[in-house]
């Protein structure tokens, strides 16, 4: 992939961060609205959870089958095309009259919103080596802020005009972002000689042959499962007694998560300095402890907010560290590395959504917290029992 004479200016970093956040946000507008959507379509909580799962499975499919195209085609054209297609998926969601149609719209939106994961390696390619971790951290902060603020925006818009308004507005914003990206991004032509089947095959071969990639992918999978377990069921908790909050108030809890995400930005800088194993160990410990505060959240809003802050801080910190580490493996194949890592990441998210909805259905908030804490403990043990020693040695 040729590198153009194009300075990665602060303005371009901001544009790419906003675009990344806006793209990935399209998968999460539904989360604070699940209770309202479930009542609209007469669904159970577990059935409504499939809406979020469909978006994440669509995203996982896009990561595997579309993101590698960033190593094959000119990136600006690819990014703009996928942004417009994601906007089209949200139009289907906004006009849906059945659960099946809504799942189709959210799955298509998820499939093409992986444009966010083509923007991240593009930023890493344009950045100088000594600032790569910092730039990746900034772009990834935009991504997680998009996930979290999506809930706040969705709740506020739903209060103003109903849940469909959320998706109409989001579709227009994505179309406008496509125009901004066309004007702002540099052209980058591919130099790979691989065809599409070979490109996909190389994703699997990299995953099989590189233990660091597999390790980081597993950590990401389990970490994002934790994230989804919390956020999928939280709308049900807050809409029920003793809280009885509206969609707008539920969405405001995304601000606490956004604050946690912003606090994780230095993780990329620590990884640049060779401290990735320390950041990972500390982050996974905090992730486990966060579930104690979250458990008390069934009676205390303050405890829930503290738990959200800590969980989102650690999820984002570990994620930034993971990506900074894997981008060092093959600098000329960052889109394929992203595909392998992020496919695992969002499979974890989809599994977490299903686990969360089922845990809420059968065990209430205590069941959700038990599921989250168990997966956090497994994640820590997997890392502690061997993986971190090898990476520290490397």
UniProtKB/Swiss-Prot annotation:
Gene3D superfamilies in the cross-refs: MFS general substrate transporter like domains (1.20.1250.20)
PROSITE patterns membership: MFS
Any one GO cellular component localisation term in the record: plasma membrane
Domain of life: Bacteria
Alphabetical UniProt keywords: Cell inner membrane, Cell membrane, Membrane, Transmembrane, Transmembrane helix, Transport
Membrane topology, as annotated: Multi-pass membrane protein
Listed Pfam families: MFS_1 (PF07690)
Disulphide-bridged cysteine pairs: none
Predominant localisation class: membrane
InterPro entries to which the protein is assigned, alphabetical: MFS, MFS_dom, MFS_trans_sf
GO molecular function: transmembrane transporter activity
Cellular localization per UniProt: Cell inner membrane
Keyword Nucleus: no
Transmembrane segments: 10-30, 50-70, 79-99, 100-120, 138-158, 166-186, 218-238, 243-263, 291-311, 337-357, 364-384
Family designation: Belongs to the major facilitator superfamily.
Protein name stated in the entry: Uncharacterized transporter YgaY
Species name: Escherichia coli O157:H7
